[in-house]
């Protein structure tokens, strides 16, 4: 709908009902965590602001709902008589927003839709074209904008007067309102609507005394640094909440929900001050904010994790103070082990500084995680080798390392470079195709594709095997009634035994908990044990040649590394990714989905995280001959007879 139609419909509905009702939706994230998750909280902030503004607000957390997104949304619209539906989405889950809005328009033609979140903030033009069912785009922070939008709609005003919106003109053009100023007084915002989005309605984790109840805690917004790969969806102006405001919320979380772990969900928790005279970073302000937080959080006896920047200001004294106050893990932005690449990324750090900070963090008894990304314009075969060697040298210092190609997120400097150089010719199709990996390096296309398809996945598997050997999970147990996996584990540091509940998604190197005795991180690499449990059933399904493995990404690669079946049986593998179709995966052909009809396929095993629901919907709509669909993550529960024991 265009802005004129929206105004007419909203005015009529407001006269009829007195107030408009809005439904806010939080996407499915399929978190990889074992006993806690940190879902996106942007919609929860907007919901809290609207409720404080006395609006009629309903909420859906798709992560907590069973069934298709279309059915969930349509049922909610009918039950609650919804007038407006809002969705907060990142680029990676825009298809969920599309599905929700399409279902909404089918259910109620006059419903008003708006899209917010990082996807709209970074790519408003593209998202409005990509999802024609979106009536209103909301750019930037949504708390004030959403309230003004609702007021304007209920009062019959002109939406063009609401800062921070993108609207459709009657002729189809887009109208960009004035930008919304950033919210500098973060203390003025209400706390997120935890209850509305069922944040703490976690699945039962058994009678374990170590069960974690984790809450995300936003203490600041914005990041002033200029890393070339970052989309800057939160802006470059850094503004912080006061400690009084922060700990009023901590009090509420602990007393009301029994929180025993906090994840500080800031781009940068505190900033070092650049000392122009000394030519180096000074830690005075940075240290004082961290010190104050440590002093205040210690009496709560909760665990906490955060993102920080490496540097000399991370002193041994500060790290010890963090450890003593309950900090269990620090996530550092590593990115590369090569100084040339780090400089090209505008990181402002060196490999030597990274190594020094990581080693001192580990020595302080804190968990240390880092991500290595590949494909910067300065990347060469030599820099790749140096980064791999760097990660190997520090392998025993990290509790978690991940390896991934650089993704060109809209809004980032690298994305803009790719557009200017003609590497991205259609920005809408680029998003629709899932932000395909794009070669900005001086490497040949063949060398780059080999890095993406073979070398980075091999480094991931190498890390997995290293962790599996060092941590040694002893038992993978299955509860068929609850569809739950449990691991019994002996800590390699202190020798104590613990059990932990796992989501069925927890088959990658992103799964961990803390040893209840020594509080050190324990990584679970369960794919090897899981593969042993499901191999027999997979073999039965593949035997007649009528089963396809759908999805050639991470979960497939990890299963391929540990499966005793895939290496001895012919099987069909499909994926919509054009690059995978062209080059295959680990020597195996990837068939386009539209070629399946001629293959006589009648069943599919879905091997995907984020795209599971869209794949299933696609199969139901376009491949009726595929009558049986299995979720690989839950395949073990179909295999009760093959796994006649509860554990290995």
What are these regions (language model features)?
Residues 43-47, 73, 98-101, 150, ...:
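Generic structural signal for well-ordered alpha-helices
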Residues 52, 84-86, 112-113, 247-250, ...:
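Conserved C-terminal portion of the radical SAM core fold
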Residues 49-185, 405-407, 411, 628-631:
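Glycine-rich beta-alpha loop elements in corrinoid/cobalamin-binding modules
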Residues 3-7, 14-33, 166-169, 382-523:
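C-terminal accessory regions of radical SAM enzymes
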Residues 482-503, 513-648:
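Hydrophobic, well-ordered beta-alpha structural blocks that scaffold small-molecule cofactor pockets
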């Amino acid at each position: 709908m265009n802005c004129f139609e929206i105004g007419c419909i909203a005015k009529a509905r407001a006269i009829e009902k007195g107030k408009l009702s809005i439904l806010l939706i939080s996407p499915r994230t399929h978190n990889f965590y074992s006993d806690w998750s940190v879902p996106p909280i942007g919609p929860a902030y907007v919901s809290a602001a609207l409720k404080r503004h006395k609006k009629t607000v309903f909420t859906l957390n798709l992560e907590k709902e069973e069934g298709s997104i279309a059915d969930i949304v349509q049922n909610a619209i009918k039950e609650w008589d919804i007038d407006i539906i809002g969705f907060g989405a990142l680029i990676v889950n825009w298809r969920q927003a599309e599905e929700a809005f399409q279902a909404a328009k089918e259910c109620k033609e006059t419903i008003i839709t708006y899209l917010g979140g990082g996807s709209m903030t970074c790519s408003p033009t593209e998202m409005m074209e990509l999802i024609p069912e979106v009536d209103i785009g909301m750019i930037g922070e949504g708390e004030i904008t959403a309230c003004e939008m609702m007021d304007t709609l209920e009062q019959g005003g002109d939406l063009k007067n609401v800062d921070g919106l993108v609207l459709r003109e009657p002729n189809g053009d887009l109208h960009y309102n004035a930008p919304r100023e950033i919210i500098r007084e973060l203390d003025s915002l209400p706390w997120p609507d935890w209850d509305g989005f069922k944040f703490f309605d976690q699945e039962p984790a058994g009678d374990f005394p170590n069960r974690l109840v984790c809450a995300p805690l936003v203490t600041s917004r914005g990041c002033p640094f200029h890393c070339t790969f970052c989309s800057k969806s939160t802006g470059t102006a850094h503004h912080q909440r006061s400690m009084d405001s922060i700990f009023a919320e901590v009090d509420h979380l602990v007393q009301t929900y029994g929180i025993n772990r906090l994840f500080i969900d800031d781009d940068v928790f505190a900033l070092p001050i650049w000392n122009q005279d000394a030519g180096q970073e000074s830690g005075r302000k940075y240290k004082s904010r961290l010190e104050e937080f440590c002093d205040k959080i210690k009496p709560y006896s909760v665990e906490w994790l955060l993102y920080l920047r490496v540097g000399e200001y991370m002193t041994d004294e500060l790290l010890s103070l963090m450890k003593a106050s309950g900090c269990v893990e620090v996530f550092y932005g590593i990115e590369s082990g090569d100084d040339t690449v780090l400089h090209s990324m505008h990181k402002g750090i060196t490999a030597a500084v990274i190594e020094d900070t990581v080693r001192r963090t580990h020595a302080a008894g804190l968990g240390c995680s880092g991500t290595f990304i590949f494909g910067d314009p300065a990347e060469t075969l030599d820099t790749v080798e140096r980064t791999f060697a760097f990660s190997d040298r520090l392998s025993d210092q990290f509790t978690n390392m991940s390896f991934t190609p650089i993704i060109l997120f809209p809004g980032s400097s690298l994305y803009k470079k790719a557009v200017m150089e003609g590497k991205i010719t259609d920005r809408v199709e680029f998003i629709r195709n899932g932000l395909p990996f794009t070669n900005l390096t001086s490497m040949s296309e063949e060398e780059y594709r080999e890095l993406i398809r073979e070398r980075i996945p091999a480094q991931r598997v190498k890390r997995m095997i290293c962790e599996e050997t060092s941590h040694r999970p002893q038992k993978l147990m299955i509860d068929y009634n609850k569809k739950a996996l449990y691991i019994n584990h002996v800590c390699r540091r202190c020798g104590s035994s613990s059990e932990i509940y796992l989501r069925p998604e927890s088959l990658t190197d992103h799964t961990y908990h803390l040893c209840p005795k020594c509080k050190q991180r324990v990584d679970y690499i369960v794919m090897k044990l899981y593969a042993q449990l499901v191999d027999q059933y997979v073999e039965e399904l593949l035997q007649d040649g009528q089963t396809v493995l759908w999805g050639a990404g991470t979960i497939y690669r990890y299963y391929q590394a540990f499966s005793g079946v895939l290496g001895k049986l012919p099987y069909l593998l499909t994926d919509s990714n054009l690059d995978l179709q062209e080059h295959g995966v680990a020597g195996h052909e990837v068939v386009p989905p539209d070629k399946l009809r001629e293959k006589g396929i009648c069943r599919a095993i879905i091997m995907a995280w984020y795209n599971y629901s869209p794949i299933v919907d696609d199969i139901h709509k376009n491949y009726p001959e595929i009558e049986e669909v299995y979720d690989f993550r839950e395949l073990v529960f179909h295999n009760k007879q093959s796994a006649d024991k509860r554990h290995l």
